[in-house]
Amino acid sequence: MEQNDKIQLFEDKRIRTAWDEEKEEWYFSIVDVCEVLSGTDNPRRYWSDLKRKLKSEGAVELYEKIVQLKMTAPDGKKRLTDVADTEQLLRIIQSIPSPKAEPFKLWLAQVGRERIEETIDPELTIDRALETYLKKGYTREWINQRLQAI
């Protein structure tokens, strides 16, 4: 797997990431995310305990999808670390009992509600797409062409 390492910052804390060119997917260091969202002094231990908890709760599929990639450690050496893609990471965040994780959980609930509404009324999908394109600065003409192509 070809990957490009990159550091992302969240509240001035580093989160190691890697882009997989082949799968066109981002991978995130789970230990880094646990450290940022839980505020723990021992993120490796926190992730180890959380893994055990997830496994005991039946989240075996999530546990099995986690892979390890070599990422640059704080000492500059490349070490294998557990990483998760976006979907897996969002699932892990739901399991972190911390006030810092609450904004993510609220956002996930909102997105889930919107997705259910769009399933019931597909026209909402078009309305939301229009609104998003306008916020991104696209012209109405471009948006209409894009929506007609769907």
Where do the PLM segments sit?
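An anion-engaging/catalytic patch
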Residues: 1-150
